[in-house]
Amino acid sequence: MYQVVAFLICACCLCACNNEVPQKSAEKSALVVPTKKKDGQALDAKLHPDLVDIQQSHSQIQIELKYTTSANFLGEKLYSKIDKAYLQKDVAARLARVQKALQQTHPGYQLLIYDALRPVTVQQKMWDALDSLRPVERAKFVSNPKNLSLHNMGAALDLTILDAKGNPLDMGAGFDDIRHIAYPIYEDSFLRTGQLTPLQVQNRKLLRSAMQAQGFRQLPTEWWHYNACSREEAKSKYKVFYTENDIFTTPTSN
């Protein structure tokens, strides 16, 4: 009997200890949140004057930055400071007009941004990760850092559309899918073979028509990628951001 009583007492003590753990963890987490918010505000204050947070251009535009987590083709977090989608101000203004027009034709629909401004250092990591592909094939998916990408200047973005219920439209291939089925140039062929459905192609065309109406150019090998202009034009008018620090360092006047 004494052994049973002792066992019950020990069990109760263990349960009591276990019940205290979540409470302490919750208290610790609650203290971390304000610090992160404060850090984010500090970075916003240092944002390069050429850039703008996309959601400041239009509050209905949503973001889900794929490279702030490990849920991407590299399987690792690539951004340490970036947690918002940044674009050149004139590019963001055009994107806001895309969202406005989309709402008029499809009430409740919203743009969802997967990536926008991307430093050259991150571009290099992506390029190196695909070293199993020949450079010609690799360049169809990731621009060679030596040539620069419009992402590196805040003049390109990766995106899709959310329906009125907040679900991404079915595009027949996921973001960062390197298979040919993700290539816009092969849509008609895959439609004929049944590998893409009419609805999937229709969804792609909806995004394409909305973006092209504001002068954005789709990459022929990625249904989600749009450039604001040509590479040559971008190089002539926009700053190149080589690191995340470049994005959050306000230039000093001479």
Positions of predicted regions on the chain:
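Sec-dependent N-terminal signal peptides
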Residues: 4-12
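Beta-rich nucleic-acid/ligand-interaction surfaces
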Residues: 120-122, 126, 226-233
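C-terminal motif of bacterial Sec signal peptides marking the signal peptidase cleavage site
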Residues: 14-16
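Extracytoplasmic cell-surface/polysaccharide-interacting catalytic and binding patches
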Residues: 18-116, 129, 133-221, 230-254
